[in-house]
Amino acid sequence: MTDYKATLNLPDTAFPMKAGLPQREPQILQRWDSIGLYQKLREIGKDRPKFVLHDGPPYANGKIHIGHALNKILKDMIVRSKTLAGFDAPYVPGWDCHGLPIEHKVEVTHGKHLSADRTRELCREYAAEQIEGQKTEFIRLGVLGDWDNPYKTMNFANEAGEIRALAEMVKQGFVFKGLKPVNWCFDCGSALAEAEVEYADKKSQTIDVAFPVADEAKLAAAFGLASLAKPAAIVIWTTTPWTIPANQALNIHPEFKYALVDTGERLLVLAEELVESCLKRYNLEGSVVASAQGSALELINFRHPFYDRLSPIYLADYVELGAGTGVVHSSPAYGEDDFVTCKRYGMVNDDILTPVQSNGVYVDSLPFFGGQFIWKANPAIVEKLSEVGALMHTETISHSYMHCWRHKTPLIYRATAQWFVGMDKQPSTGEPLRERALKAIEDTKFVPAWGQARLHAMIANRPDWCISRQRNWGVPIPFFLHKQTGDLHPRTVELMEEVAKRVEQQGIEAWFKLDAAELLGAEADQYDKIADTLDVWFDSGTTHWHVLRGSHDIGHATGPRADLYLEGSDQHRGWFHSSLLTGCAIDNHAPYRELLTHGFTVDENGRKMSKSLGNTIEPEKVNNTLGADILRLWVSATDYSGEMAVSEQILQRSADAYRRIRNTARFLLSNLSGFDPARDLLAPEDMLALDRWAVDRTLLLQRELEEHYSEYRFWNVYSKVHNFCVQELGGFYLDIIKDRQYTTGANSVARRSCQTALYHISEALVRWIAPILAFTADEIWQYLPGERNESVMLNGWYQGLSELPEGTELDRAYWDRVMAVKASVNKELENQRTAKVIGGNLQAEVTLYADEGLSADLGKLGDELRFVLITSAASVVPFAQAPAEAVATEVEGLKLQVVKSGHTKCGRCWHFRADVGSHPEHPEICGRCVDNLTGSGEVRHYA
């Protein structure tokens, strides 16, 4: 028996079937580094339109987690896709380096005895070490960027740039010093930014406290009475007993009705709607004597329960009728609303009582409770209230309360002298900051769209921004304050530039070591050099200004405005927020044109990632077991607008999808063996109809993918590429062409037409997957035939695809109908295989009973219909002649019948044909194969 295998054009490629990504990816990274890929991209892109994605800096502390990996991969996919789309898309990674977590790490390691200078030195060293570790991990993910020259908020140039940004805001009149309640952490010993506050359940002791009336006559008159028949008091409800020693006022709502309730021993003032619930809580009986509008009680004085001072009634709209009494006790030093209300009534800063120190301990001079920690003092305060007869009720509740995101300990509002950026302060020119920021939000595109309303609400309702901190490791606020007046030096902006120049050379240490006389000369004795540092959100929030326009100069020529900021949804109150405020203050516009928000990672059951639950996914482990491309494929396949589920099982499914895409690429490469595009590429008009359709379909898909990439819809890219590989290629086109590819002459038009299509598809596909499967795309690139540059990323979207000409007989709609017919035939072939009627598809002969229109369509393929259906014979018969045993299909006007062929199997093409054995020199093969071997070769027109 003759072996005809050698006469076939069998697929051949060195591209490995097994990816071996954990071993192969580091080699590809080395190659990118050796060819200077990032630098080459900058060179070829210098005359292109620019696209700037500005990196939100991760904190330089600890190993990266799955959220970091997700974020960096999303950014890389955007930068790569924009590069392929013809943009110059630089990517400068950044790190956030100052702040308490690093200072805390240094204190834990080296102790708290260190000098401030030594602390800063060690903090800088620690941050540098952490950056190197994280950088290695980010590079391992395949993220292309300027890793040799990242921006760091502790770079001298960036520290100086931040001071200059602050100077701009001072110059425009946005910065002021004020006494205001700010989020305060006793463990940090500092104010906290809004973004550093998280909420958790806390048990608190609630108290109802009676404040005896001081102005009896005024209270009686307000309720329309001649006098009060018995002692009277107003009752407040609070969850913070520790604030009672600082009480200075009582707040009621001007529009609520308040009742004077006779409880026997005394009269109580309560919100009318809450009388019943309050009396029940106090276990009292009572009746309403009179009622009055809240506004009628304004400025009536009551007495503090245990201190000899008055608490007047102030009207406030924030009072609610939920839990409580409808009366809020006001400690202006420890509540934002209280502070604003008391200031509105004329209270000056010197009158505001601030008995709680920075460590949470009452000042020693506070009667009854001096020297006690506030949380521990609560029982003593309750006991004192009971002792003086002011305690109406107490109980313990669990409620959501603000905590420090680092220490997980409860916070308080605490009025301290801090530096603020005013939200409603009138600047030297233009609108106030809040107004500017709200307008800028309207001019910004949000992905997903709901981010706009969220950020708008946050800006509309936020207080002034406290930008000062009382820490060592931070960019200084380089102000000189007059010792007598407390005013800023009149040359502050000029002096800040002098400081910035020094910081540019020596880092922030230049300020802390500076002798004031160096800058102020003889004036130095009149001024204090302040020691406050800037909020770290000011560090990262000004990077648009000192990175894009300064240290890296990657911004647009029109100014330091990025095209895109991309971070997790928590950054609406973090980096997006602080950047918006600084951008609007300095440049009167947002520092970004578009904001993209991604959700957080959860496990497959929707639970938060937690070491205690054992459901965390470590990027390093994934890289070492499955490969970074699998992680990248998971990112692309997941809709990032909500929570993103990830687990070992989910990643395994991504690995399965990866194999299908890789196998498709391998099939394409193996069937391009011996193909030289410079020599063998056919013009579109010389190609077979099916091949022209395949190239046209590829072009249509590329247009869709370009749009999905430009709109950051990566899950659609993944879905469409995967379906194209599995269904349109693997399930249709690639199956059909195998016979022609393997059995026709190596240089025949039939085979070269097919290879031309495969070449075009490969050139397009490798680019489509390049932003997602960064390593695999570059690996495929090395195996494609023809001359090419070092990396797929040095190219644009493929331009060699051609469209089916207008009026083509076998057009897109035609092949859609053929695909539907083939799907119906495949279904019946599978049924016959299951029933053991046939062994394989080529053992079958199919008869199609088609209506007139479909019959005409199928007839256009002639004898080549069998190659499309991958059966040994196929015939088309009028629908009316269908026998009873013909199978109905989902295609309208089509029935079909599959029978086992009665002919002999060809030993070369495996078709069962009547003419097998008719050629004496080749008795084992069919006439078609004989012609392909010894004659002029078969001619194909369609498939």
Curated annotation (Swiss-Prot):
Binds 1 zinc ion per subunit. ATP binds at K611. A motif ('KMSKS' region) lies at residues 608-612. It is an enzyme of class 6 (ligase). It is found in: Cytoplasm. Keywords: Aminoacyl-tRNA synthetase, ATP-binding, Cytoplasm, Ligase, Metal-binding, Nucleotide-binding, Protein biosynthesis, Zinc. GO terms for biological process: isoleucyl-tRNA aminoacylation. L-isoleucyl-5'-AMP binds at E567. One of its GO terms (molecular function) is zinc ion binding. Its EC number is 6.1.1.5. One of its GO terms (cellular component) is cytosol. Belongs to the class-I aminoacyl-tRNA synthetase family. IleS type 1 subfamily. Catalyzes the attachment of isoleucine to tRNA(Ile). As IleRS can inadvertently accommodate and process structurally similar amino acids such as valine, to avoid such errors it has two additional distinct tRNA(Ile)-dependent editing activities. One activity is designated as 'pretransfer' editing and involves the hydrolysis of activated Val-AMP. The other activity is designated 'posttransfer' editing and involves deacylation of mischarged Val-tRNA(Ile). NCBIfam families: ileS. Monomer. This is Isoleucine--tRNA ligase.
